Regions:
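Ligand-binding loop in jelly-roll beta-barrel domains
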Residues: 88-112
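Conserved short histidine dyad/triad with adjacent acidic residue
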Residues: 36-50
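A short beta-strand-loop-beta hairpin characteristic of the jelly-roll/cupin
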Residues: 56-80, 90
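Conserved metal-binding segment of the jelly-roll/cupin
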Residues: 41, 78-91, 95
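Amphipathic, hydrophobic secondary-structure cores in small proteins
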Residues: 51-53, 83
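ATP/adenylate-binding site constellation spanning eukaryotic-like Ser/Thr protein kinases
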Residues: 32-33, 53, 61, 99, ...
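A short, N-terminal "cap"/entry segment at the start of jelly-roll beta-barrel domains
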Residues: 1-32, 36, 119-124
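A beta-strand edge to alpha-helix "cap/lid" segment located at domain peripheries
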Residues: 67, 79-84, 111, 119
């Protein structure tokens, strides 16, 4: 049996996709995990949504305010150097408190992001 090969990437070489006026992203995808850089302008909103994918968000620069749950009753501010874990199917919404760069990790990969069928992000 052949051993899988490894792949090396440089973020600056990855294409930056313009998703909306306030959100850009870069994607690196493996068989079972997706690593992304997400760039959100201050005041940019990620509308409430949920997905089957487990998510880990690590803020590199700036900060995001998250509203958790269908009723958005839990509010969590996540700033540079902090991490938020969002289990599968947990509804969440986010707003950029300032220009923000975050690393999102999804397992399994977000097929809607790969297919560009993530309309909830593209409407804003």
């Amino acid at each position: 049996m052949d051993q899988p090969s490894v792949t090396f990437y440089r973020w600056d070489d990855m294409p930056k996709e313009r998703v909306s006026e306030v959100l850009d992203r870069r994607l690196i995808t493996g068989d079972r995990v997706m690593l992304t850089h997400v760039y959100i302008k201050r005041g940019g909103i990620v509308p409430r949504h949920s997905h089957a994918n487990e998510q880990i968000t690590y803020i590199l620069e700036g900060g995001l305010r998250f509203w958790i749950g269908h009723d958005e009753s839990e509010v969590i501010d996540v700033r540079a150097g902090e991490v938020l874990h969002i289990p599968s199917f947990v509804e969440h919404k986010a707003e950029a408190l300032e220009d923000t760069v975050d690393v999102d990790i999804f397992s399994p990969p977000r097929q809607d992001w790969l297919d560009k069928t993530d309309d909830y992000l593209r409407e804003k």
